[in-house]
Amino acid sequence: VLFPFVGSLKDKKFTVDGTDYPMGQHGFARDMEFELVSQTKDEAWFSLKSNDETLAKYPFEFVLEIGYKLSGSEIKVTWRVTNPAKKDLLFSIGGHPAFMCPVAEQGKQSDYYLKLDTDKAITYGLICDGGLLDKDDNLLKVDEDGYCQIDEHMFDKDALIIENRQASKVSLCTPDKKPYLTVSFDAPLFGLWSPAGMGAPFICIEPWYGRCDKTTFDGSLEQREYSNTLQAGEVFRKEYT
């Protein structure tokens, strides 16, 4: 999970009440140990709570809970963020799941297709060398059925950042256009990514509630695009499958 930030920050820092806090890409939750809260044969919940270590680099109290529920061939991932403090909690959150492509070394990645639940060309942004959003008017063309063949140079400039709810369902498809995996979400934006030039046999389909800063951004945490705000006691709950 990417929390409390998605992507990189301008100058690798954020500002709260006039104070600058250094922060690396994607925040810190992915590098911390979560507590197992509950477990059954088909569901597990994990929790991460703010502590002295997190408060020193991110001055907000939080409770982050993540649930995984298996139902047949479907996995539902649920994020629940609670603000236990009296002051507002500002955060971003996103997924970073990776899926095999090609499957079992059958063909090349460029033989496969993406399928989106739209027949309109997708506008996407690209990340510059500093990890920030730069050019955001690129076009990913899909056919009338939503298919787009994966190009071997598709990820040469890092992730494709797709904003404005242009799609809510993305499938990976075999060379004969048969979907073998679908990610469904209600996020305002999502990313598509695979390591550039490494021949990595996977593609990430990432629902996001937040993203990296633009190269032109110059403001405080409250002014960041897609920042989520919880008042005292409020709960943020989202899921994807």
Regions found by a protein language model. Name each.
Residues V1-T19:
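Acidic-aromatic substrate-binding/catalytic surfaces of carbohydrate-active enzymes
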Residues F14-G18, W79, N228-T241:
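Short Pro-Gly-centered flexible turn/kink motifs
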Residues Y21, H26-S38, E144-E225:
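Acidic/His-leaning functional-site neighborhoods
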Residues A44-F46, L64-I66, V77, I93-G95, ...:
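Hydrophobic residues positioned within well-ordered beta-strands of beta-sheet architectures
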Residues S50-V103:
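Acidic, contiguous internal or C-terminal segments within carbohydrate-active enzymes
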Residues E65-G67, E225-L230:
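Beta-strand-rich interaction surfaces with strong enrichment in secreted/lumenal proteins
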